[in-house]
């Protein structure tokens, strides 16, 4: 019985906690500590979200921006000045919605992920 309890506790630690927040623009954003990934659905087509993402990364002066995106899904990578890798995965959900996942570094960085997301969201809502 003790082994089962210890195993369940370990699984809980590995999976990590999930936190959710609603941005001022009304988007529900979740972040899983175990994965280090910020997830959300944005109102916008794949091309709109892709353009907003690339513009955001350029404005934040990230380097080595690489984009492999079509109208259904894609991946955008870049590096921060200190060498930390930023990975953004996009996937079209319906005709006017796009799923976005942002991971900063190996373990994830919630604060920087949220800052990138908010900039992307503002660009889309501004259009």
Label each region the model flagged.
Residues 1-4:
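Positively charged n-region of N-terminal signal peptides that target proteins for export
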Residues 13-16:
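C-terminal motif of bacterial Sec signal peptides marking the signal peptidase cleavage site
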Residues 18-127:
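Ser/Thr-rich, low-complexity intrinsically disordered terminal regions
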């Amino acid at each position: 019985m003790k082994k089962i309890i210890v195993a369940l506790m370990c699984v809980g630690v590995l999976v990590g906690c999930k936190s959710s927040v609603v941005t001022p623009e009304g988007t529900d954003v979740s972040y899983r500590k175990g994965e280090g990934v910020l997830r959300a659905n944005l109102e916008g087509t794949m091309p709109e979200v892709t353009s907003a993402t690339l513009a955001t990364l350029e404005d934040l002066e990230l380097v080595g921006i690489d984009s492999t995106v079509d109208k259904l899904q894609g991946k955008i990578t870049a590096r921060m000045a200190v060498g930390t890798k930023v990975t953004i995965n996009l996937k079209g959900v319906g005709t006017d919605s796009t799923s976005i996942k942002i991971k900063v570094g190996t373990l994830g960085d919630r604060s920087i992920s949220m800052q990138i997301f908010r900039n992307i969201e503002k660009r889309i809502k501004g259009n």
